Every structure is written in C-alpha cells, then in structure tokens.
Swiss-Prot record:
Full protein name: Pantothenate synthetase
Lineage: Bacteria, Pseudomonadati, Pseudomonadota, Gammaproteobacteria, Legionellales
UniProt record similarity statement: Belongs to the pantothenate synthetase family.
Organism of origin: Legionella pneumophila (strain Corby)
Keywords: ATP-binding, Cytoplasm, Ligase, Nucleotide-binding, Pantothenate biosynthesis
UniProt GO MF annotations: ATP binding; pantoate-beta-alanine ligase activity
Length: 252
C-alpha cells in the first residue's frame, strides 16, 4: 500500500493514473474495525484500485470532547487497510484540507435537519463538506459507505445526485458483532459493564415492538434514549450509555 502524507503528492500521483482505470474510495476517520474492512473488500472486488483516507474531521463533531477523545490508531489502521485490499491511503492534515479556514461548507436543508441532524447541529454540514473535498481530491469511480450511518448514506447519495457528480455511491450492509451490536469505533470506549448494556440495546432495538415499547425497555436498563424513529421503511435509534453515544438502524 502506498501512503500519501501530502495532498500535493497525492494530486500529482492521481493525475498519472489512466482514466480507463476504476478507483473505489472508502473514506474513514481511523480507529478502524470489521465494518471498514468490509468496505475495502467490496471496493477491491469491483475496481482496479482502492483508495482510503485517514482524517479525523473536526467539523463534524458538535461536541469538542468527542473530537478530543476520538481514538487515533494510525499504525493499526494502516495494517488493517493493507490486509484488506487498500492500494493507496491519504493522510492529510487539517491545514491542507481546510485551506479556506472553514469558509465554504456544503449544507442540506431537509433530511439533514432530522434525527442525527436535529440532535447534532452542524454535524452533517461537516460530513458533506469533507466528503465533497475528498471526492474532488480522489475522483473515484465508486465510493463505499456503510449502512450503519444510513442517514449519512442518504445525504451523500443526494449530494452526488444534486450536484451532478459522476460517482457511483455503493452501500454496504452493517457489520455486527456476535451480540448483534453494530461495529463502531465508539464500542472501544465502553467499559465491560457498559458493553453488556450495549449488547442488550442491540437485542431490544431489533425486537418487533413499537418504538415506544422499545424506548421504555431501554430506559429501564438505564440507557438514555435520544430518539427512536421510523423513516422511509427503516427504524433509527440514537442512545447514550454513560457518555458513549451509539446509533443503529435496520430495515423494517
């Protein structure tokens, strides 16, 4: 795997690649897990080359503590990428990415105001802006996103369509641990007792019951329920176990 620490180096290299070659892209913030590996493998099966990025994007954290405590595990992340078919990895720094001083942002005013957007103001502006920047840098044929962040997936699909971007957005199923808990970088921050509660969250959330009943059962375990909502045939949830925030969704 070839690693690019400098954006100008990447841009020069990208310009040498034949337009006849397909590029798959799976952007990440690091602290990788099996869910990320599934994106890399899906891309490597469908493209000549697979590109990823490691960048903890400050603009999508509405809570500064979340950004501060987000695990940085670069060496382990690069190893996982190497083992799962990534050919090129971009590791930009904040000054390179935001040369405009955060002056320009991508904003969506409908779906982005619901659920995650309602509870994390500004989050999706940060997501869409960094994804747009990375798309312009990588110029991928296809880009891969997990269904765990399904609202994010819908927004990226909508952005690509609205702005006439010639990129195929591929969705990949949520990867789950044996308990049914969705793989997430935040799972690493759970204490053993919190992890048991998180496993119960996954089981209860997937029960064939009303959202109100599910909320009641979760709250009885001491879980803080931010929302459980149904949207476009899926059920979405965001909860807190202690100070760890977890999200999930599934097709009804």
């Amino acid at each position: 795997m070839q690693i690019f620490h400098n954006l100008n180096e990447w841009i020069r290299f990208r310009n040498t690649l034949s337009p006849d070659l397909s590029l798959g892209f799976a952007p990440t913030m690091g602290n990788l897990h099996a869910g990320h590996a599934s994106l890399f493998l899906a891309s490597s099966k469908e493209n000549h080359y697979t590109v990823s990025s490691l960048f903890v994007n400050p603009t999508q954290f509405n809570n500064p503590d979340d950004y501060k405590h987000y695990p940085r595990t670069v060496d382990a992340d690069l190893e996982l990428m190497t083992q799962n078919g990534v050919d090129f990895c971009i590791l930009p720094n904040e000054n390179e990415i935001y040369t405009d001083g955060y002056a320009y942002q991508v904003q969506e005013n409908r779906l982005g105001q619901l659920m995650e957007g309602k509870h994390r103001p500004g989050h999706f502006n940060g997501v869409l802006t960094i994804v747009m920047k990375l798309f312009n840098l990588v110029k991928p044929t296809r880009a891969y996103f997990g269904e765990k962040d399904y609202q994010q997936l819908l927004l990226i699909q909508g952005m690509v369509k609205a702005l006439f971007m010639d990129i195929e957005i591929k969705s990949c199923p949520t990867v789950r641990e044996k308990s049914g808990l969705a793989c997430s970088s935040r799972n690493n921050r759970l204490t053993p007792s919190q992890r048991e509660i998180a496993d119960e969250f996954a089981k209860i959330f997937h029960q064939n019951k009303s959202s109100a009943m599910i909320s009641k059962e979760l709250e009885a375990l001491g879980i803080t329920v931010e929302y459980i909502e149904e949207f476009q045939g899926r059920r979405f949830a965001a909860v807190k176990i202690g100070d760890i925030r977890l999200i999930d969704n599934y097709l009804l």
